[in-house]
A protein has these predicted regions:
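Alpha-helical transmembrane bundles and membrane-interface segments of multipass inner-membrane proteins
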Residues: 1-153
Length: 153
């Protein structure tokens, strides 16, 4: 398996994010949202979302296509809700409703992309670490002693 260039991983990240953001924005523009299903977002939420995007962009440095795509999917969720918050005055529409106001919940595709991206990202990182476990640092003496006490090592 050849090395994956950073530019290729960046392209996978950007392409997956752009496509999914477009889908999210089309759904938000075409499916009506009940007034109660708009969720207010604070400036703190905006700052945290931008920090998450910066971290996701750094994940393109990990030499894995799967990590890059998963980070792009997760970023699509953050970007989709950031765009919506900007367009709708810090209120994000949630046109997908299960149930009603009293017994139900509302969400949007950006929420789904963010959660799915997180799950994919965890799986991709675990697979990468397991495949490269021979490159991990050996446990130090105190760590080996702790593992023996825990009956793990």
């Amino acid at each position: 398996m050849g090395a994956v260039r950073w530019s290729e991983r960046l392209l996978l990240f950007v392409a997956s994010a752009v496509v999914l953001v477009a889908v999210d924005q089309v759904v938000k523009a075409t499916v009506s949202t009940p007034l109660w299903a708009f969720h207010h977002r604070s400036y703190g939420w905006v700052a945290l979302s931008i920090a998450v995007l910066a971290g996701a962009l750094l994940l393109t440095l990990v030499p894995s296509r799967a990590v890059a795509v998963a980070a792009g999917v997760m970023s699509a969720g953050a970007i989709g809700n950031l765009i919506s918050a900007r367009v709708y005055g810090n209120r994000v529409p949630n046109p997908l409703v299960i149930g009603n106001y009293e017994r139900g919940f509302a969400f949007n595709l950006a929420d789904v992309f963010f959660l799915a991206g997180n799950l994919l990202l965890m799986a991709a990182l675990v697979v990468m670490v397991v495949r490269r476990r021979d490159r991990l640092a050996q446990p130090r003496p105190w760590e080996r002693a702790l593992l023996r006490q825990l009956h793990v090592g």
